[in-house]
Amino acid sequence: MSSRLVDARVRGSRLTLKRMIVGGITALAVTIGSVGVAVAHGENGATDATAARGGHAQREPVVGRAIFDRTFRHGLVHTDGGKVHYVKGGSGPALVLLHGWPETWWGWHLVMPELAKTHTVIAFDLPGLGYSAIPRDGYDQKTTAARLHQAVNRLGYREVKVMGHDMGVLVGYAWARDYPREVTRLAVLDSPLLGFGLEDAYPLSFHFKLNMAPSPVPEKIVDNSDVATYLNYVFEFAAVPDAIDRDSHIRAYLHPARRSAGYNYYRAWPENAEDTKAHAESKRLTEPVLAMGAEFVFGLGVAASFEQVAEDVRGVVAPGAGHWIQEETPEFLIDCANLFFGPEGVPAPTESLSSCVA
């Protein structure tokens, strides 16, 4: 609802939306530029700093009991794009977590145990990434959403709540739009939609255009020895860079086929933009949408974007966060998600959480 957007009042105003997005990212980019991106290579392409973090995700199995939290289990489920890897734990209504690039399900590991106290948490590796099979095609938001719809149905769920970050925002939107009876609530973290604001960020970092370039351009430019350099540049868009488990994320993209799969999600962006614009009015979201932007990146631009495709949008800014909210400010995300996905009528303990209330 527009009344819950903290008076952003930007519906239909692309100029205002662009200023919100560019202003937030430019402020962060200036900070990045002032310090530079220093990368000292360690073993397997990890930096010395990230190597000290241990690469914990690499110890996790493909199937079986999780190591990071023994109440979770890893599994694989069949879809028409191949097997999809997931990590599942907790009890209660199903809450699906969708990661972005360059991450895997591990990007959610700091918030999963708390969310699992009230929900059955299912964190997927997007098709082609992490431990999921690599599809030959179908990296657009609509096809990926259909595959995850198949996955949760085969796991026995007919209703789910969905929370997506970055690339997971695009997939979560298409899932909620195309399967409105299945997705009862949607939370989206720090990405506007293509066709409604995300393209305004293209000039602010070269990685958007590089990742979208046709094969084999990025594949030839970034080889295994370059992965740490490249991804450490990307992770400098964090406001709290030391909070990011860079080593785990870097190692997940050391395999060339995984990198190509990640690029394929970007190569689908023009198709995603057309898909979103084509259905913005005819298939507006009616389920509640929590649109959370990072203070130092997209801010209320996420809510402004979703207001153009959804009826009930609650705009929230994650204080002190850069792009990776779930790793940089996990406590705030947990508190907000528990309110939004929890029972109706529970009051917010602070003003910053007021728009998170169910």
Identify the residue ranges that each predicted region occupies.
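Signal peptide processing junction and immediate N-terminal pro/mature segment
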Residues: 36-50
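Sequence contexts marking disulfide-bonded cysteines in secreted/extracellular proteins
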Residues: 355-357
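Serine-hydrolase catalytic-loop signature spanning alpha/beta hydrolases and amidase-signature enzymes
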Residues: 102-110, 121
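Gly/Ala-rich phosphate-binding loop of Rossmann-like dinucleotide-binding domains
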Residues: 113-116
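Flexible "cap/lid" subdomain of the alpha/beta-hydrolase fold that forms the substrate-access gate
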Residues: 52-87, 91-94, 118, 122, ...
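Structural cue for short, hydrophobic secondary-structure segments
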Residues: 97-100, 123
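Secretory targeting and sorting signals
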Residues: 4-40
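Recognition helices and adjacent regulatory flanks at domain boundaries
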Residues: 107, 126-129
